[in-house]
Amino acid sequence: MIDNVITAIDRVAAEHPTRVAYDYEGTQYTYAQLKEGSDRLAGFFAETLPEHEPIIVYGGQTFDMVEVFLGLSKSGHAYIPIDTHSPNERITQVQDVAHTPAIIEVAPLPIAVPDVQIIRAPALHEAEKTHAPISSLQHAVVGDDNYYIIFTSGTTGKPKGVQISHDNLLSYVNWNISDFGLKEGVVAMSQPPYSFDLSVMDLYPTLVLGGTLKALPKEVTDNFKTLFATLPKLGLNEWVSTPSFAEIALLDPNFNQDNYPDLTHFLFCGEELVNKTAQELITRFPKATVYNTYGPTETTVAVTGMAITQDIVDQYPRLPIGFAKPDTEIFVVDEQGNQVSAGTEGELMIVGPSVSKGYLNNPEKTAKAFFNVGSQRGYRSGDLATMTEDGMIFYRGRTDFQVKLHGYRIELEDVDHNLNQVSYIKQASTVPRYNKDHKVAQLIAFAVAKPNDFESDMKLTQAVKAELGKMVMEYMIPQRIIYRDKLPLTANGKVDRKALIAEVNH
């Protein structure tokens, strides 16, 4: 257990200064460098930035980003990460909500942002080498102060800034380092972009454990040949990603324990881990433990988890997302907010110390989604789930991914889940096509097919529908299946359902 994220990382630097904190394609940075650079940057930020204001940091998967995050934390500022692969309008959308006084350019901004101080890379590099370090941590982020603010997509297209405090982060990190069996000095893959809160799953637990973050930038992950050549050289103990990214790695027949002898932990979050992906990982990595976790950004990365063993895979066609972390209570409630009985589907409510105070500068949305229970904060997740008597939770889809077709209520993710079990399908995502009255007229599935001997897509579709018909009600079978070489992913590595919906409704 740690009591402060910042001092825990500094302690590693004091005790193991030459340990490698960050490795970017073979360029290594030690904990001593991380401490000295972040201390000097903190001194610089204390002089140049207005006190306690959140600051946008624009950049990619680099050591400089981590150093800037820590420098801001030490000088009392929350950071707002924006990844270089975000669309340009994202920068202005975030700034329109956040009104930050400054943007730190770790990488060059692609557009001009008016009426804001821009701190450019040369000034950062000068400061990290020559500026006087901050003299103490008395103004550092602590307690209920915001540590980071991550923007998620809003339903109106206006993004929502989720405020995560130091105490929220501390609750998450302590659970991660105590419950997942990670060792001091762990070597962890750092693949999710910093603007996606899944990155926090590898970033802070690894640093407080004195481990090494192995950066996997998008330029590598976007090129499968490069990716498959790079991954085995990283010497990983821990893999953190969405299930979709692991499914890409599994396309390489060499992705197995023989070629990754030290890989002992898979941690998944961000989307549903399907049974056949878990089975494939368990088969290929007999020495590793596969953990399924769940949590909205609003509750700090993840709030449930469990090891997915062979017994669990055999027992549950749709895998559980685990049990609530010890300091957190999770309830399943009906539309009136009453707790439902075990096994009954309802909405997940999450109460505990890792629940956010709310959305930055958005009291209306905050009031809708968050509530107080005594001194604890609660969050209405919008996720449907069931819970067993002993507290094991099963995810059942989004309340807002429900559609009605011919009077039947259909969970798109339920259709996806079953379609992904079909023997001819590698990956699939189902979307509604609306008619001119904005009613759902058809379900359309986009799918990546496995290699097959069918003479036409029509014959393949007949076989897919026949197999799917054994798993789901007839009204849940998509009317059309469109085959693709790959499905579009969001910047966060999830299947981009919104892009597919837009495609069939243009």
Curated annotation (Swiss-Prot):
One of its GO terms (biological process) is lipoteichoic acid biosynthetic process. D-alanine binds at residues 197, 301, 494. Pathway: Cell wall biogenesis; lipoteichoic acid biosynthesis. InterPro entries: AA_adenyl_dom, AMP-bd_C, AMP-bd_C_sf, AMP-binding_CS, AMP-dep_synth/lig_dom, ANL_N_sf, DltA, DltA-like. Belongs to the ATP-dependent AMP-binding enzyme family. DltA subfamily. Catalyzes the first step in the D-alanylation of lipoteichoic acid (LTA), the activation of D-alanine and its transfer onto the D-alanyl carrier protein (Dcp) DltC. In an ATP-dependent two-step reaction, forms a high energy D-alanyl-AMP intermediate, followed by transfer of the D-alanyl residue as a thiol ester to the phosphopantheinyl prosthetic group of the Dcp. D-alanylation of LTA plays an important role in modulating the properties of the cell wall in Gram-positive bacteria, influencing the net charge of the cell wall. This is D-alanine--D-alanyl carrier protein ligase. It comes from Lacticaseibacillus paracasei (strain ATCC 334 / BCRC 17002 / CCUG 31169 / CIP 107868 / KCTC 3260 / NRRL B-441) (Lactobacillus paracasei). The gene is dltA.
